[in-house]
Amino acid sequence: MGKSESQMDITDINTPKPKKKQRWTPLEISLSVLVLLLTIIAVTMIALYATYDDGICKSSDCIKSAARLIQNMDATAEPCTDFFKYACGGWLKRNVIPETSSRYGNFDILRDELEVVLKDVLQEPKTEDIVAVQKAKTLYRSCINESAIDSRGGEPLLKLLPDVYGWPVATENWEQKYGASWTAEKAIAQLNSKYGKKVLINLFVGTDDKNSVNHVIHIDQPRLGLPSRDYYECTGIYKEACTAYVDFMISVARLIRQEERLPIDENQLALEMNKVMELEKEIANATAKPEDRNDPMLLYKKMTLAQIQNNFSLEINGKPFSWLNFTNEIMSTVNISITNEEDVVVYAPEYLTKLKPILTKYSARDLQNLMSWRFIMDLVSSLSRTYKESRNAFRKALYGTTSETATWRRCANYVNGNMENAVGRLYVEAAFAGESKHVVEDLIAQIREVFIQTLDDLTWMDAETKKRAEEKALAIKERIGYPDDIVSNDNKLNNEYLELNYKEDEYFENIIQNLKFSQSKQLKKLREKVDKDEWISGAAVVNAFYSSGRNQIVFPAGILQPPFFSAQQSNSLNYGGIGMVIGHEITHGFDDNGRNFNKDGDLVDWWTQQSASNFKEQSQCMVYQYGNFSWDLAGGQHLNGINTLGENIADNGGLGQAYRAYQNYIKKNGEEKLLPGLDLNHKQLFFLNFAQVWCGTYRPEYAVNSIKTDVHSPGNFRIIGTLQNSAEFSEAFHCRKNSYMNPEKKCRVW
């Protein structure tokens, strides 16, 4: 650059000779003083401005957090009248449920984003991939290979059906082909042992609740083809689902007969599939309601196989059913021999008693039609487009969706569900900030400490039970992010999937291979000890978990992200996000189910009679509170306060513990800077971030479904119910007494 004029002036060489110095005039003196004063004022103002702190955080992370909160909320709504609208009104205006989704919320958006990461890491093979990762990528490619899947039609399924005694409605001369060799023991066992499909009788190997280091055989009622036993009323809001279900059966039977070039008698198809529906209705009515199955002490009934034979004799196809033969048909596939002295835990004795008269009314053909159908219906979406489309009306009736999930999304989820450690490794390497592990460890320690301190406040619990509750809380083991082995131990990861070998053009066979592998692995556990260090979740999951049998809490890498957590966001948001989730999972150890298990994970009554009675009384308050919520999206049905009790107790306890932990943080570290653009303090931001986790909505069909099947209250009621019980919330938002969000009667368990 050239010199400035001032520089040129200063450095002019031809400087004139100075004149004789003169006195300053009064005006010059006055002006000089004024200039000096103005200079001092200017310098002071600049210094003050440079050091002035307006208490607002202006970092990019604070700006992002504030923008997210502002976008989601409706500041014109009254927080003390409807905090769901206040916290989520903006979100509801900006978002529409995608055609492929049955519900849509902030949780679902996080899951959608995680699926994008999975797609990116699964679709590109790399030369440095270890064998386990190569297999995961092959499985993914086989799943998205729609041209190969479509070209095969229903052929892969047709080849498999003879292995499960066929499907009578889609088989010519079934009685001649299979009838003579058919036995109930073999037919029911074959689906279970090979493919993990439990129809009519649900036999599985799981942890022994009363001795949680051991595995034991369990016998329980089966799952149903429709979402819950209520659907089988087939009237009112359930009528469309029942019609679509039978039509779905008929459509698939027709497709198979067409592909097999067999004659099609529409009347016969309708007759047989309606018979299947009649049978399944009777089975549904024999099952116990969920609210009658929520006490693990009452559910647990251990007996020998010989006692089962005596207590629950069945007659099928005119022959007595041998429980010993049935169990051996299953366990022999993993070379385990069973005698009549084998211990079995029966979860559903009433169901088995009611099953007896039902089974005598139906032929082997009827029973096999149901069993094969229940197997087939799970596999239809793995076949060609024609088969997939036969499910459209059924999917719409249950979920309200008019389009299938994008193939790549479905496939990313499928691979993650079947190879969670291989996929977890890829996800962690691509997207997980490892330093967050230590921060979350510290948060867990703080919230656990608050839980223990809070025990002193509980007037309904005696000292003896408090002491045992403290011991259990201290014994809770935490798992954060991911198991180190999945990243550091290549051999262990490769060995986990050693038996699996996928082909890129055989997606259906790959699925069958996974079913067999998974079921065999589970059955083999019968003679093995429970590995209590095993993680109960993969890493690439947006969720958190508590295991009563392990007394373990798990926070996978997938949930350790905003709005739940970020090392860079305000602590009020972290405590209202992941802090509440931590408190929620800890409290699960003391909800209506978890409280029945001791610090070692065993089903043991460690409560005094008085404390147990008081717990039930305290809980009843929440049963009534949530049971009084009416959900417009589910046709005005009321929530089930009994089925959702455990989650509601955990929500309320978790929020209270996280808030007290945040107050402790402020006492120790001082107030945080406020967020820009929000006229809210950090106590208010704590509650706002908690609420915004649950922003979302449902399709009416899925609302009807989830109100009967989901143990969680819908998101809006998780916000309202929990905050109605929080005096700290009402104090933070200055809610007058008896406003909707600040009722006089408040429920508290923990």
Curated annotation (Swiss-Prot):
InterPro entries: MetalloPept_cat_dom_sf, Peptidase_M13, Peptidase_M13_C, Peptidase_M13_dom_2, Peptidase_M13_N. A lipid is attached at G2 (N-myristoyl glycine). It comes from the Eukaryota. GO terms for biological process: amyloid-beta clearance by cellular catabolic process; amyloid-beta metabolic process; angiotensin maturation; bradykinin catabolic process; cellular response to cytokine stimulus; cellular response to UV-A; cellular response to UV-B; creatinine metabolic process. The active site is at E585, D651 (proton donor). Its cofactor is Zn(2+). Glycans are attached at N145, N285, N311, N325, N335, N628. It holds the Pfam family Peptidase_M13_N. Residues 2-28 are cytoplasmic. PANTHER family: NEPRILYSIN, ZINC METALLOPROTEASE FAMILY M13 NEPRILYSIN-RELATED. Belongs to the peptidase M13 family. This is Neprilysin. It comes from Pongo abelii.
